[in-house]
A protein has these predicted regions:
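Terminal ABC-like ATPase head and other globular end-domains that cap long coiled-coil arms
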Residues: 1-150
Length: 150
């Protein structure tokens, strides 16, 4: 089932292409390795080892999201999962989070595209040496206040 969802999530996140998980020894699925083969749009089929760092991170994220489709969790913490992604893939990643409605995400990020897709932002700032302050910004309330909501 994870392979099915991986192909689906891969295609949605990459805007096309194909993703596939292949058991190295189908006779022993619990002890064998898994080969990840992908074909990003407009490219040839590759194993994950031949991808760039950003592509590897995006494929790993697609795999994680496929697992969440099979086994949803109520809560998920992602720490700078978007750090190696280019701006286009940051936007795709952030947009895809909204497809996983059964899971609440806390995403630690420095990327603007991810922040823009959030419902609520929390920030930590230090206004004076050694004293941290927590900031909270509810983007939906802010849009209503400014009259710029959908």
């Amino acid at each position: 089932r994870i392979d099915h969802y991986f192909g689906q999530v891969f295609e949605e996140m990459f805007g096309g292409g194909k993703g596939q998980l292949i058991l190295e020894d189908p006779e022993n699925p619990l002890t064998c390795g898994i080969e990840i083969r992908v074909q990003p749009p407009g490219k040839q089929v590759k194993t994950i080892t031949l991808l760039s760092g950003g592509e590897k991170a995006f494929v790993a994220t697609a795999l994680y999201f496929a697992i969440l489709k099979v086994r949803p969790t109520p809560f998920c913490l992602l720490d700078e999962i978007d750090a190696a992604l280019d701006d286009r893939n940051v936007d795709r990643f952030a947009g895809y989070l909204h497809n996983l409605k059964k899971t609440q995400f806390i995403v630690i990020t420095h990327r603007r595209g991810t922040m823009e897709a959030a419902d609520v932002l929390y920030g930590v700032t230090m206004q004076e040496q050694g004293v941290s302050k927590l900031l909270r910004l509810d983007l939906n309330q802010m849009e209503e206040y400014l009259g710029i909501g959908e």
